[in-house]
Amino acid sequence: MIDLSLLPPPDVVETLEFETLYQEVLGIFRAHMGDQWTALLESDPVVKLMEVMAYRELMVRARINAAAKASLLAYAKGADLENRAADYGVQKLTIRPANPDAVPPVEAVMEGDEALRYRTRLSLEALSVAGSSGAYEYHALSSSAELVHVSVDSPRFSGVAVPAAVKAQLPAGAIVVVCDYDAGLANPLPGDVSLAVLARPDSVVPEAQLVATVLKALSAEDVRPVTDRPRVQGGIPSDFQVEAVLWVEAGPDPDVVLAGARASLDKAIAGARRLEGQLPVSAVYAALHVTGISRVDLVKPVEGVVCDKRQYPRATSISLTTKVVT
């Protein structure tokens, strides 16, 4: 799937500079006035009028730029993105429904723009009738707004030659296969599709309920290829601990620096929380080495966290202490 962030800026979006527009207005004015106007002073009322015209032109072109970007999937936001997604037959999911009767009233919590944008792009995969990985991922993500990530895998088998005496006891035309890769499934069979699902961190829906919801959606006759058997499981946490000593430069408040380092680390861990996610030791160092930190002595983890398609990184404890450089 194309990474939208790597696309060049669209030519329809114009680069705007006030001075360029002002010089254009000034050129048009001079072409009409000829030598009859020479009072080119900043304080001249005519100059002020031309500056206003150039500014208004700048605003109009900026509005055109915004409208052009709102029509593109890579840049659209909010209601513009919802309308763009509707062109693909995709609707924004509701995470928490509104409760107007509550005191105070509770607004609905909706799917975020980036999640909707991602599903919209995946929706093209759903047009495949061959059961592509992208199609399974799209249908799984669309089954519940509680999900943030889905991985798709399948077991692999190879044929085995058997002795003639054994073959004679098998049904006519039977073949014998062995499983070379189980894709995390118990007793895998040809045609199995292994899916792992990961819920958002604040989800209150039981994992078993999410698994059942996804399995029901993927088993629909208009979704599942007749030769496939989807099998869904919850993501498996790959637990790790973070323990580090942060050496704070003389001057800054150690508590303030510690809070900044903790926030940076939390962000890095949250970004790695996905199936098949990774959190290298270098990423932990980078997250902790914020402004005001002179050195980081990392005790744990000793090795980076590397997950397979059914695992995701999960920090079970974080211990950060500070020492001031003297």
Regions found by a protein language model. Name each.
Residues M1-A130, A135-H139, D255-T326:
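N-terminal polar alpha-helical/low-complexity "assembly arms" that mediate subunit docking
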Residues E125-L275:
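Carbohydrate-recognition loop of C-type lectin domains
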